[in-house]
Each structure stands twice: as structure tokens, then as C-alpha cells.
Amino acid sequence: MSDTLPLLLRAARGESVERPPVWMMRQAGRYMKIYRDLRDKYPSFRERSENPDLSYEISMQPFEAFQPDGVILFSDILTPLPGMGIDFDIIESKGPQIGDPIRSMEQVKALRPLNPAESMPFVGEVLGRLRKTVGNQAAVLGFVGAPWTLAAYVVEGKSSKNYAVIKAMAFREPELLHTLLNHFAESIANYLRYQIDSGAQVVQMFDSWAGQLSPADYDTFAAPYQKKVVDLVKQTHPDTPFVLYISGSAGVLERMARTGVDIISLDWTVDMAEACARLPEHIGVQGNVDPGLLFGTPDAIQARIDDTVRKARGRRHILNLGHGILPGTPEENGAAFFRSGKSVMDRIGTLA
């Protein structure tokens, strides 16, 4: 029975598979002409991600073009914020903008508990449609932002180079920040449960900005809330594989493994063999090709994929980039990544 399940789901569960499954973070996006054409027609990011017909169409674009082993919901980590009472927009070339940044306990106390089915029914609809369309040809992936990263956006009010505002809060008003982080942890766990109930078979949590923390501060402000999300989700959905990604994670890999996740998504600044040596054997790995390599030649992409898969041999491994694919990447190189990933065992031999 298990053989009929999607390759990525079987691999994520730790089953023996014929090759590492392959997908790409941000595989639906600006490097694809078909996406850019749709963006020109619908310039609002929130419309593209919150209109179920558009979100579904965009989610399917890379599947129809490249047949990756995973199809991820086209959305944003900030999508749940309005359901908690925090408005935002995403401005092309400027990134996320928070209308009223959270700076006081009064604002935190006024936040609503998240009811995803009520505030984001479009997410459930899209996930259900994706499952129905792709069947067992690919796994459907859901995702969320982790509490620290969501807090970084809503406290700073936008993307930041140095995170001075939230770090000031962390070190001057830690109780305020912990209250916010706890609210996000409970809400994000609810959101993930909703995604799984709607059709997501594997979920990934992005703590994009946790790499900006020292290891000690990671232990205080990021890891406990990552673990809380994982624990709450595992209580109700113990069999759904859970992936954690942090950009700039080389200094906290061992700490990430203690959060209860099943798979750690590595960025490209750590060698795959070194990461595997540092992580417990029961933890799977995802990654970790440098997205910048996709500006190179197909031969270079193939060689790096072969090296990465060879180094992860014997470990539960999902082939991916070490970050989202970059805007401006030649679309044919995206195709080369998938092609080389799917044929890797023909070149390096079996995984056994």
C-alpha cells in the first residue's frame, strides 16, 4: 500500500526509497515567465495568494512544468496575520509592510486567537484541490512561519537588516516578547493542523530570521516556541512529517534537532556531510544546493546535485535548494535542477 503513496511522503517518513525526492523552495515564483505574466495581470500579492483560483493555479505552475515530487501551497508566512488582527501588505521590491507594528502589551493582549477555517478558508480550499489534482504523483506541502520570524516582522514593521527593534524588545521587555511569541505558537499550531486536515501531507516551518540570533538567544526566543508548535501539532497529527528551515542555521543545527522535528532543511553554508555528522541519525535532512548555482551551467548544477546526494547517502534526504530559488534564475536551469535531481541515481548508483 505504501508504494502507492507519493515518493516525498514515503521519504519524509523514513521509508526506503528509490531516489531522494526533489522540490524547490519558492518553486512557484518570479523566475517562471508564466508566473510573471499572471503577476502583471494581478499585481497584488495578497490577491494572488488569497484568491483560491489564483493560488491554486500558481501552486500548479511548477508541477505542470517540471513535475517536482512536492507541490507546495502558494501563500506567504504572513497570511495568517489578519486572522489575528494584524493587517499587512506585500509591496513588490519592498517586501512585507505591517500597518501598525506591535510594540506594547496592550496590542498583544488585543490579538485574536487564530481560527483558520474562518479567516483563511481559501487555504483549505486550495490544499484540497491540490491533493485531488496531483493524487499520488506528488506530495502536497503546507507551511508556516515560526513564532520568532513572525514576531520579527510584526515588531519591526517590515524586513530589517539588523533587527534592532525586536532585539531591543527581547532584552528590555522580554515578558512582552514572550507573550507575543506564545500567542503566535498556539495560533501557528492551529494553522498547521488546519492545513493537514485540509490536505497537506508534509509541513514545513520557516524560521527565516532565527539565524540572526546568538545560540543562547536562539535557546530563549526561538527554539522553545518552535518546539511548542511541533509538540502541539504532533499531539493531533503524529504521523505528518515536520520540516524546520532556518536561514543561517550552521551555528544551531544541533539545537534545531532538539525541537522534535523530523527533518532539518539545511541552507547552503554548511556542507551536507558535515551536517549529517552533526545531526542525530533519526533526523532527516533537506537541501542544500546553493540557489546561486542555478545561475551557472546545467553541468555545474548536475555535479553539485550528485555531490549533495552522495554526501547524504544513508540518511533520510529530500533534495532541495538551501534557500528559495532566486528571481532572475534562468527558467531552463530550474528545469535542469529537477531533471538532474530525478536522474541522480543513474549517475551515482543506488542509495543502499
From Swiss-Prot:
Q: What is its EC number?
A: 4.1.1.37
Q: In which pathway does it act?
A: Porphyrin-containing compound metabolism; protoporphyrin-IX biosynthesis; coproporphyrinogen-III from 5-aminolevulinate: step 4/4
Q: Where does the chain bind substrate?
A: 26-30, 76, 153, 208, 323
Write down the Gene3D superfamilies for this protein, in alphabetical order: 3.20.20.210
Its quaternary organisation is:
Homodimer.
Q: What does this protein do?
A: Catalyzes the decarboxylation of four acetate groups of uroporphyrinogen-III to yield coproporphyrinogen-III.
Q: What is this protein called?
A: Uroporphyrinogen decarboxylase
Organism annotation: Synechococcus sp. (strain CC9902)
